[in-house]
UniProtKB/Swiss-Prot annotation:
Required for the biogenesis of the MyfA fimbria. Residues 1-34 form the signal peptide. SUPFAM superfamilies: PapD-like, Periplasmic chaperone C-domain. Disulfide bonds join C127-C164. Transmembrane segments: none annotated. It comes from Yersinia enterocolitica. Belongs to the periplasmic pilus chaperone family. Keywords: Chaperone, Disulfide bond, Fimbrium biogenesis, Immunoglobulin domain, Periplasm, Signal. GO terms for cellular component: outer membrane-bounded periplasmic space. The gene is myfB. Pfam families: PapD_C, PapD_N. This is Chaperone protein MyfB. It is found in: Periplasm.
């Protein structure tokens, strides 16, 4: 018996064979290759948790920064306003510098202008970010791994980690410390809201707040855990907390970044 194949039939099967070969070729090739995933974090460790900037300072203030990684990073510095977005009348130097593995450097913050009140603190933010290298940079350590693994598939994840720390501009006439006045905070309850009034000229940065035997989530007041000078803010209370007299306890973070004593009041 003789079979007759049309020209169109042969062309179609030839096309199908070539098409499937092109699809399967990368998979067969990948099976013989290694797939490597690595992650490099670019972060900076600071020697302080906050900066107290005397309003009359001319020379500015400085702080130490450390590269905790075992590879070099770039460090980017800038000062922002209280909203963490608007520019601030301060200059951080150097604005961009290299910090080798395990090494420590210093950043200086200097005021460049601005009008600040004389009767209370003002809040700015010093933001420090670890910056990874661009592909092709001489100091990019991943280039060496790429050359040694040309036959492998490499996924190198670079994580840039930034942090913003409080820059508290303090007038010279404020002789006391925040922890010396933290006991003057006024607390009261309004339904499921715990409200605090700050009659002092200092930013009060809370470490902990508890009402009765329940800890209050400071994040419920927003992204920050402080109350501004001569201002008020609210914290959400647990829904199951009954409205009855209770003792409130609070601690603040002092100028050194440590916990204060426990302050108490009845509300």
């Amino acid at each position: 018996m003789k079979y007759k194949f049309s020209h169109n039939f042969i062309s179609y099967n030839l096309f199908l064979f070539v098409f499937m070969s092109l699809i399967l070729l990368p998979y067969s090739h990948a099976s013989s290759m290694g797939f490597n995933t690595s992650q490099h974090k670019f972060s900076v460790r600071t020697g302080e948790t906050r900066i107290i900037y005397p309003l009359s300072s001319v020379k500015g203030v400085s702080l130490s920064v450390t590269n905790p990684q075992d590879y070099p990073i770039l460090v980017q510095t800038q000062v922002k306003g209280e909203d963490k977005h608007s520019p601030a009348p301060f200059m951080a130097t150097p604005p961009l510098f290299r910090l080798d593995a395990g090494m420590r450097g210093r950043v200086r913050v200097t005021r460049t202008g601005g009008n600040f009140p004389e009767d209370r603190e003002s809040l700015q933010w010093l933001c420090i970010t670890g910056v990874p290298p661009k592909e092709g940079d001489v100091w990019d350590n991943s280039q060496h791994d790429k050359k040694n693994n040309m036959q492998d598939v490499n996924l190198n994840i670079l994580l840039s980690v930034g942090t913003c720390m409080k820059l508290l501009v303090r007038p010279d006439q404020l002789r006391q410390k925040p922890e010396e006045m933290a006991g003057k905070l006024i607390w009261h309850r309004n339904g499921q809201q715990l409200q605090v009034n700050n009659p002092t000229p200092f930013y009060m940065n809370f470490k902990s707040v508890s009402l009765g035997n329940k800890n209050i989530k400071l994040s419920s007041a927003g992204n920050e855990n402080y109350v501004a000078p001569f201002a008020e803010r609210s914290f959400s209370l647990p829904v199951d907390m009954a409205e009855r007299p209770a003792e409130i306890n609070w601690q603040i973070i002092n100028d050194l970044g440590s916990e204060s004593q426990v302050f108490k009041a009845n509300i």
